[in-house]
Amino acid sequence: MSETAPAAPAAPAPAEKTPIKKKARKAAGGAKRKASGPPVSELITKAVAASKERSGVSLAALKKALAAAGYDVEKNNSRIKLGLKSLVSKGTLVQTKGTGASGSFKLNKKAASGEAKPKAKKAGAAKAKKPAGAAKKPKKATGTATPKKSTKKTPKKAKKPAAAAGAKKAKSPKKAKATKAKKAPKSPAKARAVKPKAAKPKTSKPKAAKPKKTAAKKK
């Protein structure tokens, strides 16, 4: 009895695993079938755009166009009606006749042109952004070049005043030598001017002879 007891619960385990795999396969297969075809809204817009009727396309004409494209109309009748209502609410389709899904529908030209314009604007904005990025690159080059120029100029300016100071110092001893040379010859010139002043008493001798002439006249 001890040998047969553990064998009984091991048998139902594989039976439980099999239905889980089947369910997973069914879900994957259903998802693939739904994703394979385009959505109903796209098929409706294409059918309405292809029609040349001015008053719009009726629901019956839409179903015929969808059936010709290979869409199962009988199974997806409710989806067609919901797709028409959503397209009218968005503004892609305009309902010219009737109410709800039972009526005639036409493409909204304003909505179609409005969808095309934003795409063109986005493309233009992307083109405008590219030259702005290219213009930033030369700015970086100029920023790096400016400090190099400043470092080169500063030592040159410092050297010039040093050279000018050296030139001034060299000129100043020349002036001192010139002043010393000029002052030395002035002293003999003053001595020469003093000597003629001592000869003035010689001129006083002829003045003393004047009274002699007057004495002769009295005789």
UniProtKB/Swiss-Prot annotation:
Residues 20-35, 119-140, 149-160, 168-185, 192-219 have a biased composition (Basic residues). InterPro entries: H1/H5, Histone_H1/H5_H15, WH-like_DNA-bd_sf, WH_DNA-bd_sf. Residues 1-15 have a biased composition (Low complexity). GO terms for molecular function: ADP binding; AMP binding; ATP binding; calcium ion binding; chromatin DNA binding; dATP binding; DNA binding; double-stranded DNA binding. The modification N6-methyllysine is found at residue 26. GO terms for biological process: chromatin organization; chromosome condensation; negative regulation of DNA recombination; negative regulation of transcription by RNA polymerase II; nucleosome assembly; regulation of transcription by RNA polymerase II. Histone H1 protein binds to linker DNA between nucleosomes forming the macromolecular structure known as the chromatin fiber. Histones H1 are necessary for the condensation of nucleosome chains into higher-order structured fibers. Also acts as a regulator of individual gene transcription through chromatin remodeling, nucleosome spacing and DNA methylation. This is Histone H1.4. The gene is H1-4.
